[in-house]
Amino acid sequence: MSSPPSRRSSGADPLRLERSIPAEALDAIRAPFLSAGAAPVDAPVLQPLGLLLDLAGEAMRSRLFVVSGDGGEEACLRPDFTVAVARQHLSSGAASGRYLYEGKAFRVAPRGSDRAEEFLQIGVEAFEAADPVAADAEIAALAWAGAAAGGRDDLTLLLGDVGLFAAFVDSLDLTPPLGARLKRTFSRPRQLKAELEGDAAPAAATERSRIAALLAGLPEAEAAAVLQELWSLAGIEPVGGRRPAEIAHRLVEKAEVVKAGRLSANQADKVRAFLAVSDAPEAALDAIAALAGPNRAPLDAAIEGWRKRLAGMVAGGVPAERLVLNAAFGRAFGYYDGYLFEVRSAALGEERPVAAGGRYDGLPARLGSETKTGAVGCMVRPARAYAGGGE
């Protein structure tokens, strides 16, 4: 037995449902997905809470409906299907697979919002070693076809790419620790702002710490042992219940931030200019290419891949004039590690995407897979796609 789901942010009211849509409209929206060559799958509604938070980030907790089991373990109602389907694929032992799902997902609406909290999604998740650029184009075109089948004439396909930002950062020829740190901030606006303003590396405070500098070159277990020995020699007992390993970890982190360095003013300006790019894709790619640093080969390769991806989308039926590439576009779910997109309606606004998807090649490994394969998928919200609906 499990306790009822707890509402993280809006009291104990029943889940807010979305509007139903006519059967013929749902059939039209579903049709492109039925022709995508995917096997139907029924993913479990309950998913491990800890796993979702590890993958999506602690900030996602407030959007999840949590269920506590008799054994004390916590689960949540699936907020989407990607992780649930990926787990099923891995448990099957298949080297590759393409799956079609249709079912309800659940998210707590933001306080004061009228968004539905239980809503229908139709989608495809593909775990294949095929050409990733071609697969990306196919999946984006599939999402567009499903979204457009609802009859809306105000749709835009917004594109972004975590990998494009990574390639741009590589072009700047930063120290490896600084480059890695900057890449991690892409979907964390406050941390990114701190990097750009030079607040992420408080040199004056940490460079004075000789202990931190000493520990920085040691493995963490060894650093903890050294710290424990120093305390013993000085007759000091740590306060607050913090263990030597925890304190050593924080000291090492601080020292490594200093060693990694900061962005120069010119580099920070380039990053700001990159993040400001939002235009028709070809113009956006030209603007990004003009910002490349001295090590431009990775960025040039990423841009060439994007030109092929765009050609594939247009060939797959996406109108070129409906495409927008936004260099700063990211998603709340931290497991997306490549290109990503949303189909947006002008009438519904950016907070209510009609369809969404992207590439998450790293997710299977994070779920325990030892086989490296591509992973990409998309979903559509039929109630939003339907021209006579909305939520």
Name each model-derived stretch.
Residues 61-71, 173-207:
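Acidic, His- and aromatic-enriched active-site or binding-groove loops in soluble protein domains
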Residues 9-16, 61-74, 122-127:
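Glycine-/proline-rich flexible loop or hinge segments
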Residues 74-94, 191-205:
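Electropositive, surface-exposed helix/loop patches at the edges of structured domains
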Residues 55-59, 171-173, 339-341:
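Short low-complexity, flexible loop/linker segments enriched in glycine and/or proline
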Residues 44-75, 115:
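Polyanion/phosphate-binding surface patch
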Residues 2-4, 18-37, 41, 47-48, ...:
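Positively charged, Gly/Ser-enriched RNA/tRNA-binding surfaces
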Residues 121-194:
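Internal, well-ordered domain-core segments that constitute the primary functional module
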Residues 45-46, 159, 181, 325:
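Proline- and acidic/polar-enriched loop/turn elements at helix boundaries
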